[in-house]
Regions:
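Conserved SxxK-family serine transpeptidase/carboxypeptidase catalytic domain
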Residues: 271-313
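Short, positively charged and aromatic/hydrophobic N-terminal segments
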Residues: 5, 10-19, 24
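Conserved catalytic or metal-liganding residues and their short signature motifs at active sites
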Residues: 19, 28-271, 278, 297, ...
Length: 370
């Protein structure tokens, strides 16, 4: 009986139907394994591709670790922007930028401006900045200079506008009138400092910005001091411009301001040498002679009473505050010291002044300065 059961089991186990079923099951399991492995492989490839794509999108646009800028002009197109990118050093990822630009529809959103390319900015982030017009501001320093033409020449390299456009705005009568100044007094609006502006700022907008800074600078306290000195803010700037040119010594400036205020109050001509240089347009003059003193100009304070029509340079805040905080004394004259230190000998009487002037003239002669 036992042998019969074993025989039946052996028959079932080794029957053709059973063998086929086992084979079919093995095939199915193998297919499943292959499908799983293929799926895992495809997923791995997708992960790698996604990683590469993310790297290309968010990796630094170029190899520059410091500041680097892309300047886009008003007439630039998407193609000219990409051409500018390709012309940059440090291996820019222009192809990736084109791809990102297509994703962001940059072609219809080209904005002029100055854009940061360096400091590790990613390509996708860069293209978002370009599309949104998110410029990097410019640090614009307003310097102490002699003329409006000098100012235009100094500011232009930092801006899209050229020096001619800036100078035109600085002398535009209608624009200046809207700001309460004219071509003679507009230098007072320029308060030397460093300001943040956009590279694309127009000359007109720049003047309005400078006017706002001027209004901020002239606090209630400064206005009160100007009034106490008997001057308007523009007159303070005009006198400060003379003080600026008379001495670079900050400690001496309040004394110089006090001397000129004394002369104004006594009805004396200022007789300031820097105004003669301005009238002649010769700022390199080292020795003022009698022939220079007769220059026919409203700025020549040897010929004209009172202050000049406007500032003879862009005065620094230090010179302006020297006028507002002028020194109270009885000096009416001053002359450069004979030691050429850049400081001055002050005098209350004309006789004292002549003695000081004689010593200085002798020192000039010894040095052969004419």
């Amino acid at each position: 009986m036992k042998n019969a059961k074993l025989l039946v089991f052996h028959f079932v186990l080794h029957s053709p139907c059973t063998t086929f079923a086992l084979f079919k099951r093995n095939v199915m399991e193998t297919k499943k394994k292959r499908i799983v492995m293929a799926g895992a492989g495809a997923a791995l490839v997708l992960v790698i591709m996604a990683g590469v794509a993310l790297y290309l999108l968010f990796a630094p646009f170029c190899g520059t670790k410091g500041n680097a800028y892309l300047y886009i002009d008003a007439d630039d197109t998407v193609d000219s922007v990409y051409f500018k990118m390709e012309s940059l050093p440090d291996n820019p990822r222009t192809s990736t930028a084109r791809f990102c630009g297509a994703l962001l529809s940059y072609g219809s959103h080209v904005h002029p401006g100055r854009y940061q390319l360096g400091k590790g900015i990613g390509t996708f982030q860069l293209m978002r900045h370009l599309r949104g017009g998110l410029q990097e501001p410019v640090r614009l320093t307003v310097p102490v200079v002699h003329t409006l033409a000098d100012m235009a020449a100094r500011l232009a390299p930092r801006l899209q506008a050229d020096s001619a456009a800036l100078y035109h705005a600085f002398t535009d009568a209608a624009l200046l009138d809207s700001l309460g100044v004219d071509t003679a007094t507009v230098p007072a609006l320029f308060i030397p400092n460093t300001y943040e502006v956009f590279w694309t700022i127009t000359p007109s907008a720049l003047l309005h910005r400078l006017h706002r800074e001027y209004e901020t600078f002239w606090t209630a306290e400064r206005k009160q001091k100007a009034e106490a000195a008997g001057l308007t803010p523009v007159e303070v700037s005009t006198l400060a411009s003379i003080v600026e040119q008379e001495s670079a010594n900050s400690a001496e400036r309040p004394a110089i301001a006090g001397m000129y205020l004394n002369r104004l109050r006594q009805g004396m001509k200022l007789q300031a040498d820097p105004t003669v240089k301005f009238a002649l347009g010769d700022f390199a003059l080292r020795r003022i002679l009698h022939a220079h003193l007769v220059a026919d100009s409203p700025y020549n304070t040897y010929r004209n009473q009172g202050l000049p029509p406007g500032p003879i340079c862009i005065p620094s805040p230090d010179a302006i505050d020297a006028v507002l905080n002028y020194q109270h004394h009885d000096y009416l004259y001053m002359c450069a010291k004979e030691d050429f230190s850049g400081t001055h000998n002050f005098a209350a009487t004309y006789e004292e002044h002549l003695a000081n002037a004689r010593r200085y003239a002798e020192a000039l002669n010894r040095r052969g300065i004419k």
